[in-house]
Amino acid sequence: MAEITASLVKELRERTGAGMMECKKALVEANGDIELAIDNMRKSGQAKAAKKAGRVAAEGVIVARIANGFGVLVEMNCETDFVAKDAGFLGLANEVADFAAANKGTEIEALAAQFEEKRAALVAKIGENMTIRRVQYLDDARASYLHGAKIGVLVAGQGGDEELFKKVAMHVAASRPEYVNPTDVPADVVEHERNIQVDIAMQSGKPREIAEKMVEGRMRKFTGEVSLTGQPFVMDPSQSVGDFLKAAGATVSGFIRFEVGEGIEKVEEDFAAEVAKITGGNA
């Protein structure tokens, strides 16, 4: 049986909002598989739709550029928020973004190699590790949005103006859509959610035909919630983003959203334990 660690229980609690004992029991029954535990908890009514994995734990900045008909987002990481505000660190991050904007398609390995000497010199000067973590390009980018340099968004599309696409980019930053349109949600994702909703509906005790209608309604809601055009517009929740775009004669063809440290979990060591280790346990 897989080890059920405290950090695994903590993550399940954060993603489902369920109690500690319920989370531990679900993980034991799922043999430590957190995604299976979430599915089982949803089917049993212990949890609603879970938050996506990807706790933000690393520090750093997101830098955006739009040039020559395309956009680029770059993430550069460091260890502390203090260094994330350092002029030298910010200068290097912006230099990397400028290079990527001038050399479309440069992949992360080549980008890291290009700036390795400068990165190493800055590490030696500041005394803290830093990495150029990722880069992504978007054709037909119309607007970018940075939220405190911690979240970066690019939006591509046709019609409308820069102000319109800037508003859409702000929405993407706030609402975290995963797809552009409800029809873009992959078939396997739809099928996975449908299976969960069928189990939930059948447990209601209602006739099958009613249960099936319930599932169809919930699936429309699900695909709307995870897609940009199906979400309520953050600046005017009375209309969807799709309605907002349609009224302006505009369409979105794609977007990219970066958040500093997505998917990275920084190990937080207990301060007392660290002191004890340094002093040989004679604190």
From Swiss-Prot:
> Where is region (Involved in Mg(2+) ion dislocation from EF-Tu) located?
80-83
The family classification in the record reads:
Belongs to the EF-Ts family.
Q: Where in the cell is it found?
A: Cytoplasm
List keywords of the entry alphabetically: Cytoplasm, Elongation factor, Protein biosynthesis
User: CDD domains, alphabetically?
Assistant: UBA_EF-Ts
Principal location class: cytoplasm
Name this polypeptide is given:
Elongation factor Ts
- GO CC term, one of those recorded: cytoplasm
List the GO molecular function terms. Answer: translation elongation factor activity
| Cited function | Associates with the EF-Tu.GDP complex and induces the exchange of GDP to GTP. It remains bound to the aminoacyl-tRNA.EF-Tu.GTP complex up to the GTP hydrolysis stage on the ribosome.
| Top-rank lineage group of the source organism | Bacteria
